[in-house]
Amino acid sequence: MNPDASFAPIISLAPWFDTPAGAYARAWEQSRLDELTADIFGYNAVQIGLPLFDTLAANRMPNRWITDSRLPSAEISGERQVVVVHDFTELPFATQSLDLVVMPHVLEFSAEPHQVLREVERVFIPEGQVIICGFNPISTWGARQSVGRMTGAHFLPLHGEFISVPRLKDWLKLLNMEINRGHFGCYAPPCATDKWLRRFSFLEKAGNRWWPYLGALYIVQAIKRVQGMRLIGPAWDKKRAVVPSAMPVTNRMKKQRDRHG
């Protein structure tokens, strides 16, 4: 399977984060991600997709990788270095080898979100944790996107199939993963300019207090539970090496140059 083809829609998401609404969303997500990842400990952490984000910036694990479904784009500034390019439905990591996986807007732009989650569950150690970012369909932004699909005037990237938190919770439960923390945020209406987004900034506190589940974005943190197991100390092997089996970016670039040279 060609990973670039199976996840092509996510490419349109990165430029959207350069818009005023995108910058507003990105700032909120980065702040919440820093809070969540700072207190997660272990040895091996991976960010899957959207290298525009630095989701592991506040995390202190010794081994941290970022993977993506495509080669880095020279057209998108600020993208972090991608270590491995692979199909998101086939994670290039050993079974029970990762402590933390962060997926910023991966599931909603995937053709096979269930398979992506199954792969994440496979690579987790017992009590491994996943953090998932998504657009909330039950929000003013979600309503605006639904109208845009009918009128052709889209506010969010066209190809996203946004997943509600209750639905995501059901998917995770089937894989013995339990949501233990979560945040909703970005309560301003779907405005296209900084001026109007700032005018509605007062809604952040009001939204958190009065309608907390109607934020435009959510971030959930879930833990892989293993029945009958209770961890007293680290349950992983410190010497275990996580060796990505997909093709490193540098090798893919070299092969492309050789092919065209």
Regions found by a protein language model. Name each.
Residues 89-101:
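A short acidic, Gly/Pro-enriched loop at the edge of an enzyme's catalytic core
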Residues 129-159:
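Conserved class I S-adenosyl-L-methionine
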Residues 31, 35-91:
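Class I SAM-dependent methyltransferase SAM/SAH-binding core
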Residues 114-129:
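A short glycine-rich, Lys/Arg-flanked "PGG" loop and its adjoining helix->strand segment in the class I
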Residues 178-204, 214:
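Conserved catalytic loop of SAM-dependent methyltransferase domains
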